């Protein structure tokens, strides 16, 4: 129990993780926690896991895929009596969830490759996204070597990790400051980003995505958004209170901007921003390539657990 609570605290203070890293860390911590329970029933560990899940949902808004996973764990805890649900059964449920969703990344990247020819292209990337890693791994395997411009992706600087990964795959990567995109946008053929959360008319992603997307619109450069259906907000089943909780972002610690500002100066930092869907070109998901206006037609509904704390 203590180890899981410590893992929650560690994740709270590790502010430079990408969305993919946060998602993978949470899944790992849940699996290890359930394994440590040694087959005992949820009567012994269920309340602790519920509390930690609600902390994760609160501390990591805008990550709709993470919420999708955590909500499914709560649904399991909600639908079975605690004295009838063993940690072994819950762990098997988590492994089944991982196995079910594992092929999705392959489908998304294949759909992009079928839709967009990157031979001799120049590509702009922002953030650090596992789908982007897998896409470029396939391109390397196929001998397709586009020229890459990778942003630093402030304030978390997570673009550095993606630049290292892509360079390790054999690509030439120009590592550029976010604010200098205007100098490079005329040189690119396509901007590729992920999306942490998609709603009917807009999507949430790393801060800077809106600025870059507006530049691409102005210079008539296509913007493709790679994600899977878990990133789409379950609008039909979610209360207004839950939607507000999942889309609210309080200002982050801004010490990296200015540790000791003078009186009258207030550094403000956010990790995410919101981009109108009508300024991008396509969403690429596991079941196809979609125009922005088609997103609200997709059925991504699933039950919402009553164990979720919707206060914020």
What are the residue ranges of the model-derived segments?
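Long amphipathic alpha-helical segments
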Residues: 1-93
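Non-catalytic, soluble scaffold/interaction modules
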Residues: 54-85, 93-105, 110-113, 126, ...
């Amino acid at each position: 129990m203590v180890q899981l609570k410590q893992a929650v605290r560690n994740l709270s203070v590790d502010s430079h993780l990408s969305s993919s890293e946060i998602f993978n860390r949470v899944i790992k911590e849940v699996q290890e926690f359930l394994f440590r329970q040694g087959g005992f029933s949820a009567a012994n560990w269920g309340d602790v896991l519920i509390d930690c899940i609600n902390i994760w949902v609160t501390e990591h808004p805008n990550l709709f895929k993470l919420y999708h996973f955590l909500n499914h764990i709560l649904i399991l805890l909600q639908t079975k009596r605690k004295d009838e649900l063993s940690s072994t059964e819950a762990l098997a449920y988590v492994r089944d969830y991982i196995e079910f969703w594992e092929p999705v990344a392959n489908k998304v990247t294949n759909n992009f490759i079928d839709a967009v020819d990157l031979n001799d292209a120049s590509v702009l990337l922002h953030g650090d996204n596992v789908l982007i890693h897998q896409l470029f791994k396939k391109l390397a395997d196929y001998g397709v070597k586009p020229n890459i411009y990778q942003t630093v992706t402030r304030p978390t600087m997570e673009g550095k990790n993606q630049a290292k990964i892509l360079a390790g795959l054999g690509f030439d990567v120009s590592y550029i400051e976010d604010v200098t995109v205007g100098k490079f946008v005329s040189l690119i053929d396509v901007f590729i980003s992920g999306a942490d959360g998609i709603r009917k008319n807009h999507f949430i992603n790393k801060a800077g995505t809106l600025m870059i997307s507006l530049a691409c619109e102005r210079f008539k450069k296509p913007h493709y958004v790679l994600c899977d259906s878990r990133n789409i907000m379950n609008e039909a089943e979610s209360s207004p209170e839950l939607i507000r909780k999942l889309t609210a972002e309080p200002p982050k610690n801004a010490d990296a901007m200015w540790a000791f500002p003078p009186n009258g100066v207030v550094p403000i930092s956010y990790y995410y921003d919101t981009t109108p869907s009508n300024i991008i070109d396509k969403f690429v998901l596991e079941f196809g390539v979609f125009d922005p206006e088609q997103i609200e037609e997709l059925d991504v509904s699933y039950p919402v657990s009553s164990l979720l704390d919707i206060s914020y």
